[in-house]
Amino acid sequence: MSNFSISAASNPIEKTLVLGGVKSGKSRFAEGLVQQRFDSLVEGADTPPTIAVIATAQALDDEMKKRIARHKDDRPAAWQTYEEPLYLAKQVRALADADVILIDCLTLWLTNLLMCDDDEMMRTEVDDFLSAVKDCSQPIIMVSNE
């Protein structure tokens, strides 16, 4: 993924989906996009832009705990992380004041919904999430496996 070059001077309310294989660097690539957006917003701003990271992973085993910790350590301290394994739409709407929202990762979120074994809840949450993304006036960068 390091061969990609993305300009931050694009539509300010764009929605971006970063796809890749497991451990392919997609989170790091998405974080680079967020950093580009941050850098473009910080110029001339009175206050630093707010970056909201919605993490959907659940630390259910040692390997996942280590991965979550590594991701947190890799991000700038000023980025606010919100852990939300199920109710993603509610969290997106709650972050209406953020300048940029990063969601990592949709694959884990869908897996979490499937594990609830409640088809109606899953359909409702997916529909609500799609509406929340559509209605969101901030750029959203989303990460998912292929």
Label each residue range with its predicted role.
Residues 12-94:
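Conserved P-loop
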Residues 2-16:
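Phosphate-binding P-loop
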Residues 122-146:
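Substrate-engagement module of ASCE P-loop NTPases
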Residues 74-122:
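Helix-adjacent hinge/juxtasegments
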Residues 17, 100-102, 141-143:
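Structural motif
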Residues 40-48, 94-98, 116-131:
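Short, glycine- and charge-enriched coil/turn segments that flank and shape catalytic ligand pockets
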Residues 53-55, 104, 142-146:
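Short beta-strands and strand-loop turn motifs
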Residues 49-52, 99, 139:
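Residues at the starts of beta-strands that form the adenosine-phosphate
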